[in-house]
């Protein structure tokens, strides 16, 4: 039996004859909203941590913190991970807590408020090369889905002009409704594959967050592709990516598959 190639070393090819579906993360893979999320998180934590620094200059929230503790995770999981890392102790609170309340949920809701303000002010842009790749996947006969921890999936896809390119969606609203654990647990990806009617082993996962790459590997998906826009290729490969590319322009679709629809 041949050994599986080292993570991150497979040819940058999706063979439509091997797979039935491709599941995409949204922020950072399809849309240039990861930078908006980071900016909102930075505003939140730079203010919050400075407020709690007790006369000592607080260490700012940096991109490395975003990638390590927040990227790909739900808002509440991200807040709690950062607070734990900074040894800040707040009650969890409830999802109904108003933005800015001195609870983890209050901070999570404040982050959501900041993100929506930036989204309204700056708009949403899709990565053109990602749109080309999604269209190539569909032209090859593969089903497509979006998986995101965001509760604003429909608004973002609509604003980016991507709402008609996917057969299924699993987002933060679904996660709350159905009790799906966030990444790095594979629950949301597994739910997307189930909605498409395709087994995980016959499904490709495309992710930019290490937590999402790990979720794809833990879920037993047939191919896990990491998209490295932030210098995290090594971490993605270590997390389980079979292929790591800097942009989806580097990933080719070969072969054809009848979708049977």
PLM regions and their residue ranges:
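N-terminal helical cap/lid subdomain that shapes the substrate entry/recognition surface
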Residues: 6-10, 15-26, 30-128
């Amino acid at each position: 039996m041949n050994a599986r190639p080292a993570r991150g070393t497979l040819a940058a090819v999706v063979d439509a004859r091997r797979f039935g579906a491709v599941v995409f993360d949204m922020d950072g893979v399809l849309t240039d909203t990861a930078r908006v999320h980071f900016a909102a998180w930075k505003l939140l934590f730079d203010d919050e941590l400075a407020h709690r620094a007790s006369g000592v200059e607080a260490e700012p929230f940096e991109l490395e913190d975003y990638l390590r503790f927040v990227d790909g995770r739900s808002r509440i999981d991200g807040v709690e991970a950062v607070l734990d890392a900074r040894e800040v102790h707040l009650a969890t609170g409830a999802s109904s807590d108003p933005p800015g309340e001195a609870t983890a949920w209050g901070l999570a809701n404040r982050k959501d408020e900041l993100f929506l303000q930036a989204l309204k002010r700056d708009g949403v842009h899709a990565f053109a090369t990602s749109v080309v790749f999604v269209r190539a996947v569909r032209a090859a006969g593969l089903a497509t889905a979006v998986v995101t921890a965001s509760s604003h999936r429909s608004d973002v896809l609509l604003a980016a002009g991507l709402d008609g390119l996917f057969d299924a969606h699993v987002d933060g609203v679904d996660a709350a409704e159905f009790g799906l654990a966030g990444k790095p647990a594979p629950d949301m990806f597994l739910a997307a594959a189930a909605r498409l009617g395709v087994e995980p082993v016959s499904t490709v996962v495309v992710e930019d967050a290490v937590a999402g790459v790990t979720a794809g590997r833990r879920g037993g998906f047939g191919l896990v592709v990491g998209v490295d826009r932030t210098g995290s290729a090594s971490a993605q490969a270590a997390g389980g990516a079979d292929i790591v590319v800097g942009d989806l322009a580097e990933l080719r679709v070969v072969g054809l598959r009848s979708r049977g629809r």
